[in-house]
Amino acid sequence: GQVLELSGAPEELLARVDEGATLYVSLADGLPAGFEPVVGLEPQSRERRREFEPITLSGVSGEPTLPACGSHRVRHRATHAQVLGTEADGSPAFTVAGYGRGRVFYLNVPIELYHTSTPGSFHTEGAPESWRVYRHVAADLLAGRAVSKSAPALAVTEHDLASGERLIIAINHSPEALVDRLALSPGWVWSEPLRGSVGADGTVVL
């Protein structure tokens, strides 16, 4: 295992959070040390994981569950963090805490490592809806987008152009054809697509 010193993170990173940015942190098998002022959690114990009941994110839209992955588990006590998800025994698993004018989200399992080492964990039936974590973390940013989408496997990026327009790029990350609707925010209209097609109601087929 490793000992993480989050308080020793690059000063520029925490300075940006202090000024209003959002930071997301997930834990693998390390034992966090000295990060309570940043994350709002106080580590209580660390042990090899013996309980594998799913984590429930009751504070996230859709109340998804995530696999209790990772070789070790750290039990925490919330000090000033808001608990958004818990393990089966009620121990904090997904939290958010204020840091200056910004926020720090913390996930107590290495969901990214799980996805990179588990074939089909993104798109097969019963795959964990971990995308809901990122949508929750990025909610404020997404609110300022010109378009919104529904399909988790559809990636959408926006790029400002000098003309005051935005270039929208949509990519299907699933192995099958995908149909979704790109809903425009007020004040935006579609121009002629550079590639592919967009229906009058924003429907795309990729």
Feature names for model-found ranges:
Residues 1-206:
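A conserved amphipathic helix/loop scaffold
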